[in-house]
C-alpha cells in the first residue's frame, strides 16, 4: 500500500536538496532566457496528479487499453481548448515536445530526401528547421533562407529559392528572430510552387493567443508549438491545423502515434488543458501585452548605452545583442551576467565570426521576468544593470553590486508569492 505522506525530503535527501536549490535559484535569479517561463501552481498540480499512472495509447474514444474514460475527458478538454484558442479545427495535444511535434509533421508530409526550405539557424532559425546536426538536416535536403541587411526576413530571397529548388515544404518560425513574420506572404510563396507551409510558432504562441502577434493558423497547412515558453504551460508540444483536410489530420495523428510516440503523458496533457484555459483569461492578454512592452523598453536602454541590437529593435518578446563591436563573446557575457544572478543565453548573431559554442551575442527575452510582475520601470533598471556588467565584465565589484540589486528586486517580485 502506498501512503500519501510519503515524501522525497525524508526518502531521498540528495535529490531533495537539488530540487530545493533549483527552487531558490529560480526565486533569486532574474530569468531572461527567451524560451523559459514560470508555469502556474495549477499546471504543476495537474502534472503531479495520478494521471501519471495511466497508459492511454491511441486517441479519445479509440484507445488500445481499457480504463481510459476519464483520461479521454482530460485529453478532449485540451484538444477543444487548443482549437478554440488558436482558431483551428484540428489539434493534437500528445507530442511530448516541440521537436517531436515537428518530427511528426515531417513524417506526415514528407519522404526522406525531400527538399525543405527553412530559416538558417545562424540567422534565427531552429535546430529542427534543417540544422545538419538534427534529424531534419540528416533526413531531408535543406535549403536555408535568411534575413536581409536590416535584419528582417528576406522574402524576395525566399521566393527566389523556392522557385529555384521547388521544395515540398517551406518552414516558417524561429528561435531568435525579433520581427513580425508575414505568414500570408509565406503562404503565397508556398502556393506559387505547390509546397506545404508549415509554421513552428513555439516562441510566440502566447503572444498569438492574446492577439499581440499575427496568428499563422489561418495561413499555414500545419502549425506546431510548444506549450511552455510564452504560453507558460507545461513542457510539451502541440499540432494545429485548419481547413478541413481530414486526410491530412489522419496523417498527422498517425505520425504522432504510432509513428513517433507510444503512450501519451496524460498528466502533462492535463497541464496543457489548464494552461490553455488560463490563456483564455483576460489577465493573460494583459500579461502578453506587457511582455511586448517590456522587451521594447529593454531595447531602448541597450541602444542608449551604445549596444547593437540585431534589426535595431523588437516586435515580439525577444531580441539579440550583437557584441562584436564590444569585443565580447556571448560566452563571456552569459557567464558574467550569470555571476550577477541574471540568466541569459549566448547566441549566434548574423555573420558571427565565432563558433556556436562561443558566439558573439546574447539572446534576451521578457516572458519570465514579466511573469514576476516587472513592468517598464523595472526592466529598464534591469537593462541598465546588465550594461553595467557588460561594460565592466572583469570587475567583480561591479558584478557583486548588481547581484545585490538583483536579489533585492527578486525579493520584491517573487515568482511564487
Curated annotation (Swiss-Prot):
Top EC class of this enzyme: transferase
Family from the record: Belongs to the SHMT family.
Cross-referenced SUPFAM superfamilies: PLP-dependent transferases (SSF53383)
Residues bound to (6S)-5,6,7,8-tetrahydrofolate: 121, 125-127, 355-357
EC number, UniProt record: 2.1.2.1
Keyword entries, A-Z: Amino-acid biosynthesis, Cytoplasm, One-carbon metabolism, Pyridoxal phosphate, Transferase
Modified residues (N6-(pyridoxal phosphate)lysine): 229
Substrates-to-products reaction catalysed: (6R)-5,10-methylene-5,6,7,8-tetrahydrofolate + glycine + H2O = (6S)-5,6,7,8-tetrahydrofolate + L-serine
Subcellular localization, as worded in the UniProt entry: Cytoplasm
The protein's required cofactors: pyridoxal 5'-phosphate
GO MF annotations, alphabetized: glycine hydroxymethyltransferase activity; pyridoxal phosphate binding
Biological role: Catalyzes the reversible interconversion of serine and glycine with tetrahydrofolate (THF) serving as the one-carbon carrier. This reaction serves as the major source of one-carbon groups required for the biosynthesis of purines, thymidylate, methionine, and other important biomolecules. Also exhibits THF-independent aldolase activity toward beta-hydroxyamino acids, producing glycine and aldehydes, via a retro-aldol mechanism.
InterPro entries on file: PyrdxlP-dep_Trfase (IPR015424), PyrdxlP-dep_Trfase_major (IPR015421), PyrdxlP-dep_Trfase_small (IPR015422), Ser_HO-MeTrfase (IPR001085), Ser_HO-MeTrfase-like (IPR049943), Ser_HO-MeTrfase_PLP_BS (IPR019798), SHMT-like_dom (IPR039429)
Subunit-structure text: Homodimer.
Record site: Plays an important role in substrate specificity: 228
Superkingdom of the source species: Bacteria
Involved pathway(s): One-carbon metabolism; tetrahydrofolate interconversion; Amino-acid biosynthesis; glycine biosynthesis; glycine from L-serine: step 1/1
Any one cellular-component term (Gene Ontology): cytosol
CDD domains: SHMT (cd00378)
Protein name (Swiss-Prot/TrEMBL): Serine hydroxymethyltransferase
Main location: cytoplasm
Gene Ontology BP terms: glycine biosynthetic process from serine; tetrahydrofolate interconversion
